UniProtKB/Swiss-Prot annotation:
Organismal lineage: Eukaryota, Metazoa, Chordata, Craniata, Vertebrata
Its membrane topology: Single-pass type II membrane protein
Transmembrane segments: 5-25
Entry protein name: Neutral cholesterol ester hydrolase 1
Keyword Coiled coil: no
Function according to Swiss-Prot or TrEMBL: Hydrolyzes 2-acetyl monoalkylglycerol ether (1-O-alkyl-2-acetyl-sn-glycerol), the penultimate precursor of the pathway for de novo synthesis of platelet-activating factor. May be responsible for the hydrolysis of cholesterol esters (such as cholesteryl (9Z-octadecenoate)) in macrophages. Also involved in organ detoxification by hydrolyzing exogenous organophosphorus compounds.
Catalytic reaction list: a 1-O-alkyl-2-acetyl-sn-glycerol + H2O = a 1-O-alkyl-sn-glycerol + acetate + H(+); 1-O-hexadecyl-2-acetyl-sn-glycerol + H2O = 1-O-hexadecyl-sn-glycerol + acetate + H(+); a cholesterol ester + H2O = cholesterol + a fatty acid + H(+); cholesteryl (9Z-octadecenoate) + H2O = cholesterol + (9Z)-octadecenoate + H(+)
Family per record: Belongs to the 'GDXG' lipolytic enzyme family.
Recorded name of the encoding gene: Nceh1
Amino acid sequence: MRSSCVLLAALLALAAYYVYIPLPSAVSDPWKLMLLDATFRGAQQVSNLIHSLGLNHHLIALNFIITSFGKQSARSSPKVKVTDTDFDGVEVRVFEGSPKPEEPLRRSVIYIHGGGWALASAKISYYDQLCTTMAEELNAVIVSIEYRLVPQVYFPEQIHDVIRATKYFLQPEVLDKYKVDPGRVGISGDSAGGNLAAALGQQFTYVASLKNKLKLQALVYPVLQALDFNTPSYQQSMNTPILPRHVMVRYWLDYFKGNYDFVEAMIVNNHTSLDVERAAALRARLDWTSLLPSSIKKNYKPIMQTTGNARIVQEIPQLLDAAASPLIAEQEVLEALPKTYILTCEHDVLRDDGIMYAKRLESAGVNVTLDHFEDGFHGCMIFTSWPTNFSVGIRTRNSYIKWLDQNL
């Protein structure tokens, strides 16, 4: 009996050691976040083991674990019709809310899920619940795009998928089929999905027939640049779940089919050092010393290497492509973008990407709403149901849907 108690105490201590990580005092539901982070880290470690044994790619294994516990079939309710179909060969899940009696034509949001271009699905419960709620509360048609993921495809194929599906949906006969008002269609996404939504919005500015097709864009803690991994938020939240800095850098390398040997060099900005001439013209477009307010910059200092590793950009030129990093787009591209909503979270390495993009868009004359949550963390908006229900998740979701309701 005594030995059993000792063993139990040891196991509990070990579990507590694995679960506990230091967190900012202001973050929402810290112990729940620790448990969520421990679960995700455990899944990552299992997938890495599977990869090291040569059984499968670690991202395929990790995504299998993630989607196995939450993927669900298209299930309609009295208020929302849900169907799986494809738009020009791209899988989508369509959520049709009931039209308002006084408005026979409905609004619509094209939604792109997050997951580092490699994980998650439009069909997992988190996104299914979010889009169902949006369709019901907005009386709208929500098109959730099931774009292809790394390692099946790499940049820019994910962008091609969302553009193809969106162009198909915007055809007059398709909008008519779903009873959607062509003047009230928006694009939205979270995290990597926010990146793809921003890229799509910019790509549409190059095509005259598509230039004014989208009424708005709503970007939720979007990832927008891969040039500077030492913005104040990257420095402040480098170890904060669920997106530590080294994980974000690896997602970028996965997206570009790059070499993990570059991770440490990129973390200290060796890929965009002063001797990398190809990056020189782009630095001013994300100069956080001028784009961020003093309350955000605090006492953080820029990390700018005099000499670095020019080989990184030579091997991965996509790092400097605005299609991958919408924050570095030219001014005239930004000027053509529609009304924009950007949601940022204080405890997120991507916080400053969103704030800088809002500033650049504002300077370009775009109507921008920046919605910042002091207790938010990356990914929080989809965590609204037990056992992963966070107070900030519910508040961010409600604020996001309220803005869409008022502006779409």
